[in-house]
From Swiss-Prot:
Responsible for the release of ribosomes from messenger RNA at the termination of protein biosynthesis. May increase the efficiency of translation by recycling ribosomes from one round of translation to another. CDD domains: RRF (cd00520). It comes from Campylobacter jejuni subsp. jejuni serotype O:2 (strain ATCC 700819 / NCTC 11168). Pfam families: RRF (PF01765). The keyword Cytoplasm applies. This is Ribosome-recycling factor. InterPro entries: Ribosome_recyc_fac, Ribosome_recyc_fac_dom, RRF_sf. The lineage of its organism: Bacteria, Pseudomonadati, Campylobacterota, Epsilonproteobacteria, Campylobacterales. GO terms for molecular function: ribosomal large subunit binding. One of its GO terms (cellular component) is cytosol. Belongs to the RRF family. The gene is frr.
């Protein structure tokens, strides 16, 4: 019974950590990251399709992303989808591919991204605390139903807190790592 509670807490906490890492990919660092385009979809024969499923997306160099569609007629669609996504760059269609040129980031942009990273980390911590609350409620219910003793409940609460602390530390480390990556020129 308790192991199920702990396993559920671990699984949900891992998902929160993965969501945070995915959120971090949307933040622009000193070098381009093709994952900044992951959320962009294009109209492909009437269906909204992720950009990376209709084109080859490559980082040509530290400041350029090249998008080569598998079908030429998609060039205009890709260009307008990127423009609509408002990622801070204008797409450049050369007839073969769409190129995105990212200017060097200013100090202010870097600091703004650090703020966003910290906010993302805080959101993940709130999620971890909510998971802790659910786990503690499940332990409390077992104790109330006399399925476990008071001593077992105390140990379970300690284990739940230990797992919470572990994931909170992982989040803090992730935010600190992302912060140093963002501030590196």
């Amino acid at each position: 019974m308790l192991n199920e509670i702990f396993n559920k807490q671990k699984t949900q906490s891992e998902k929160s950590l993965e969501a945070l890492k995915k959120d971090f990919t949307t933040l622009r660092t000193g070098k381009v990251n093709i994952h900044i385009l992951d959320h962009i979809t294009v109209d492909y024969y009437g269906t909204q399709t992720p950009l990376n499923q209709v084109a080859t997306v490559l980082a040509s160099d530290a400041s350029t992303i090249s998008i080569t569609p598998w079908e030429k007629p998609l060039l205009k669609t890709i260009e307008s989808a990127i423009a609509a996504a408002n990622i801070g760059v204008n797409p450049n269609n050369d007839g073969e591919s769409v190129k995105l040129f990212f200017p060097p980031m200013t100090r202010e942009q870097r600091e703004e991204n650090v703020k966003q990273a910290k906010a993302m980390g805080e959101k993940a911590k709130v999620s971890i605390r909510n998971i802790r609350k659910d786990a503690n409620d499940a332990v409390k219910k077992l104790e109330k139903d006399k399925a476990i003793s008071e001593d077992e409940a105390k140990k379970a609460y300690d284990e739940v807190q230990k797992l919470t602390d572990t994931y909170t530390t992982k989040i803090d480390e992730g935010v600190k790592s992302k912060e140093s990556e963002l501030l590196k020129v």
